[in-house]
């Protein structure tokens, strides 16, 4: 008997026709049952965050008649280098508005937009070696001079709102924030 024959693993039936879920499907449904979700991707317009938002909304709707003290929390693990500020803002608003408590747990990295989402949790935890980072972001504008001017005004407004949000959600004072806001500030 050759070494290759010893390593063969027999399969029962055709896995393509099986009624068993794929490993990804199994993990998804098990995590959903356990109310555990992950933001482990770039926060952009790829709709992963929108899909997660839909799930959180649906759970809130399904459990609207359960007394608040009996609600089981949702755990949201974050490992993200960040991304789009608008996407992060809508998701932060949703998390904060959730009737169901949402616990955010930073693992590895929670930077930029990922850091903002981390701050939105009703309770927050971070693994010991997690890197948290905040900065004023970056943007690119195109269009007419007037369109670019309006876009810049809007971006400055968003940065001021982000500053107010961070100051509200942390013990960082305004002087310290202002001193560090123009760089990648690792906390």
Predicted regions and their residues:
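Terminal-region recognition feature
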Residues: 1-187
